[in-house]
Structure formats: structure tokens, C-alpha cells
């Protein structure tokens, strides 16, 4: 088949590589987001997919929108049998959805219809889900509402963070994509159950609420890795790894109390958050053991 691949972040690289390395299908072009300034020097940086595509000698297009007639005409000229979309970042208009023989298919890292939207992996961790998975669906005009072509489950380990779980789901999605492309004529699409649909939003707040339980705080640290933070005496302190425990003897203490020199933090419901790896703003990351050597932490406040 002739395939147009649309993707942008690291998550989509495995899917592209899986087509290149494990199928006989031809990728006629790759679509990705335009290069953006990144880093302290604001150097114009290509997306991971852009870089990988160029390494393989593939033609890359970076339109700002697919709604323009000229862009749609170019896709028609490429004559794709199918368009594969993996975390592309642009809306696919109905005019494009209808161009390929087999339409557009999307890899979504959740067990649809649970966790539709922009942050399904984050939400699975935040809500304490014991399992998640990958859904490959036939795209329509809705928000992750298309019929399911293939779906597989994956257990979430207690120590998984957004990085480790994304890698696992990316690998699973790549293997599933090969299966779908090689059997596309024999697949029977299954409609999603709208009664079970849940939705996610892009996450913009990375603050850890100490007034929640320590278990919830740990989920947030894992889901927002490595950006979750508390304020330590007014300065941002990132917590990259943590554990928690219960202690009924501390019920009289208010949340945010620092219990000892190891910086165990009282949270809601007699739960204690134990930071393990931290990073003060402007500093390098370090173990909590090294961090507390520089402070008498019980004299400081956590918010």
C-alpha cells in the first residue's frame, strides 16, 4: 500500500519505524509539525519524526494547516491508500479523511472510549488505573470517536511514570500498526460505546497539591514527570520520584508539615509523602539525602 504518515513527537517514531522495518508498504510522504525554537538558545528544532524521516530519505511536509485546498490537492496527488496518524498535532479535516481508499487510521494510547483527547497516558496514571492500552481506530470527524480496528491492553506498573509508560505504549502501538496494515482488508470495525466515554484535557498545571493524599501526590509526580513541583519556602522544588506511607499518629498535624530531617511531608488523611529525587529551581537534580544536607528542612515551609 501507499502510505502517508502523519506524526510529530517521540511517541510516533516507533510507529514510523515499524512500517519501514517490518512491512513492504511504501511511505510516499511524511507530514509533521513545523520546526520550532527550543532550548535556552531558542534554536529552530525539527520534530523527532522529521529527523527520522529525513534519515530514511523520505519526503517531509510541514504545513501549518490541512484545511487549505492546495494542501488537500497535494495529498490527492500523492494517492495514498491509507493515512496513518500518530500524535500529529493538527486537525484532519473531513476532506482529507475521505481521500485514501482505507481512510485515515489513528494510534491512540488508551482503551477507547476511555480517555479520549490530548492526555490519555497522563490521565491513566493520575486516576490510578491498573491498566491501559492502545487503540487503533478508523478516524472520523469526532474527537477520538472512530470505530475500533484493533485494541490491546497493557498493565500499568506502580512505578511507571509518563516516560516509561509512553515507551511501552509506543512499542505496543508500533507492533499493532503492522498487524492492522497487513490485515486491513479483513478487519471488522467496531463502534465505540458512547456511554463509557471519558475525556482528557491538555495539562498545564504541574503543582502538587499537598492537601490531597500522598498517594494522589505520587500519582501526580509520576504522571507529570519530570515537571511536578511544590514550593519550598517560595521556590519551585521539582519532585521527580517519591513514595508514600500511612501513619495514624500524625492526625493532629496539618498538611504540609515537615516531619523530620528526611523531609517527609504530611498530606491529607494521615498520609506522608517521601520525596526521593528532587531538583531546586536553577540547580541540578539530586537525591533527597543530598538535598537535605544543605538545609535544616524543618525550618522551611512546603506549599
Curated annotation (Swiss-Prot):
Residues that hold (6S)-5,6,7,8-tetrahydrofolate according to the record: 110-113
Transmembrane segments annotated in the record for this chain: none
Cellular component GO terms held in the UniProt record: cytosol
The UniProt record lists the keyword Transferase: yes
Catalytic reaction list: L-methionyl-tRNA(fMet) + (6R)-10-formyltetrahydrofolate = N-formyl-L-methionyl-tRNA(fMet) + (6S)-5,6,7,8-tetrahydrofolate + H(+)
Superkingdom classification of source: Bacteria
GO molecular function annotation: methionyl-tRNA formyltransferase activity
Keyword Glycoprotein: no
Function: Attaches a formyl group to the free amino group of methionyl-tRNA(fMet). The formyl group appears to play a dual role in the initiator identity of N-formylmethionyl-tRNA by promoting its recognition by IF2 and preventing the misappropriation of this tRNA by the elongation apparatus.
Family designation: Belongs to the Fmt family.
Name of protein: Methionyl-tRNA formyltransferase
Organism: Ehrlichia ruminantium (strain Gardel)
Amino acid at each position: 500500500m501507499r502510505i502517508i504518515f502523519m506524526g510529530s513527537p517521540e511517541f510516533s517514531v516507533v510507529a514510523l519505524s515499524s512500517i519501514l522495518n517490518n512491512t513492504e508498504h511504501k511511505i510516499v510522504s511524511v507530514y509533521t509539525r513545523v520546526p520550532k525554537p527550543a532550548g535556552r538558545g531558542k534554536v529552530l528544532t525539527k520534530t523527532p519524526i522529521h529527523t527520522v524521516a529525513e534519515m530514511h530519505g523520505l519526503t517531509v511536509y510541514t504545513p501549518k494547516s490541512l484545511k487549505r485546498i492546495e494542501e488537500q490537492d497535494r495529498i490527492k496527488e500523492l494517492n495514498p491508500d491509507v493515512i496513518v496518524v500518530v500524535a500529529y498535532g493538527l486537525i484532519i479535516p473531513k476532506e482529507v479523511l475521505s481521500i485514501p481508499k482505507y481512510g485515515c487510521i489513528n494510534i491512540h494510547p488508551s482503551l477507547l472510549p476511555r480517555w479520549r483527547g490530548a492526555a490519555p497516558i497522563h490521565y491513566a496514571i493520575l486516576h490510578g488505573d491498573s491498566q491501559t492500552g492502545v487503540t487503533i481506530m478508523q478516524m472520523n470527524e469526532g474527537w477520538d470517536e472512530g470505530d475500533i480496528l484493533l485494541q490491546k491492553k497493557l498493565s500499568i506498573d506502580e512505578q511507571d511514570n509518563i516516560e516509561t509508560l509512553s515507551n511501552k505504549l509506543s512499542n505496543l502501538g508500533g507492533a499493532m500498526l503492522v498487524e492492522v496494515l497487513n490485515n486491513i482488508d479483513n478487519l471488522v470495525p467496531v463502534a465505540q460505546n458512547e456511554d463509557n466515554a471519558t475525556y482528557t484535557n491538555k495539562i498545564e498545571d504541574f503543582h502538587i497539591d499537598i492537601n490531597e493524599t500522598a498517594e494522589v501526590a505520587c500519582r501526580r509526580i509520576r504522571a507529570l514527570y519530570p515537571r511536578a513541583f511544590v514550593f519550598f519556602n517560595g521556590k519551585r522544588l521539582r519532585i521527580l520520584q517519591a513514595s508514600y506511607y500511612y501513619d495514624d499518629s500524625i492526625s493532629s498535624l496539618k498538611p504540609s508539615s515537615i516531619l523530620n530531617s528526611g523531609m517527609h511531608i504530611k498530606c491529607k488523611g494521615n498520609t506522608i509523602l517521601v520525596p526521593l529525587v528532587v531538583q531546586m529551581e536553577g540547580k541540578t537534580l539530586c537525591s533527597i539525602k543530598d538535598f537535605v544536607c544543605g538545609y535544616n528542612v524543618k525550618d522551611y515551609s512546603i506549599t
